[in-house]
Regions:
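Conserved beta-strand in the GNAT
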Residues: 58-61, 120-121
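Active-site/binding-pocket entry motifs
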Residues: 53, 65-67
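A solvent-exposed interaction/effector surface
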Residues: 28, 64-65
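Core segments of cupin and vicinal oxygen chelate
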Residues: 3-7, 13-55
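Vicinal oxygen chelate
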Residues: 1-10, 14, 35-38, 86-128
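Short beta-strand micro-motifs in enzyme catalytic cores
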Residues: 43-45, 73-75, 106-110
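Mid-chain, well-packed structural core segment of small domains
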Residues: 68-92
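Structural motif
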Residues: 9, 55-58, 72-74, 107
Length: 128
């Protein structure tokens, strides 16, 4: 594994109140299967990640001392075409804050909220 640059994100956690609802949303929008992680009393389900490759891993977390929603951090998920995932958001209980929009030479993004009110980004980078 290569040593990552110190300014890259190495892990993220999205705090949720209802894990079953959150898993349904994220697995449905992204067409993936989350994996259990850590002790059951914490309630963590992780997104797949490959160590040593571009991007980072993270997890949904349900913990009584950490409320969901209302923070100022946005996690952006890479998508081949963010309009595809954007169309799935309402089907799985989320809402669209800003539909697919250009961010110039950096591609396109959609801003959405999951069922717990967490703001997430769907990012389609421009490929050379």
């Amino acid at each position: 594994m290569n040593t990552p640059a110190m300014n890259t994100v190495g892990w993220f956690e999205i705090y949720v109140q209802d894990m079953a609802r959150a898993r349904h949303f994220y697995e449905g929008v992204f067409g993936c299967e989350l994996q259990p992680l850590g002790p059951p009393e914490v309630g963590m389900w992780s997104f797949a990640s490959a160590l040593g490759q571009y991007g980072c891993g993270g997890a949904l977390v349900s913990h009584p001392t950490m409320p969901s929603g209302g923070n100022s951090t946005v996690v952006y998920f890479f998508c081949a075409d963010c309009a595809v995932e954007e169309a799935r958001v309402p089907k799985f209980g989320g809402t669209i804050e800003r539909p697919k929009m250009s961010i110039g030479p950096f591609g396109h993004v959609t801003l959405a909220r999951d069922p717990d009110g967490n703001l997430i980004g769907l990012h389609t980078p421009l490929m050379p």
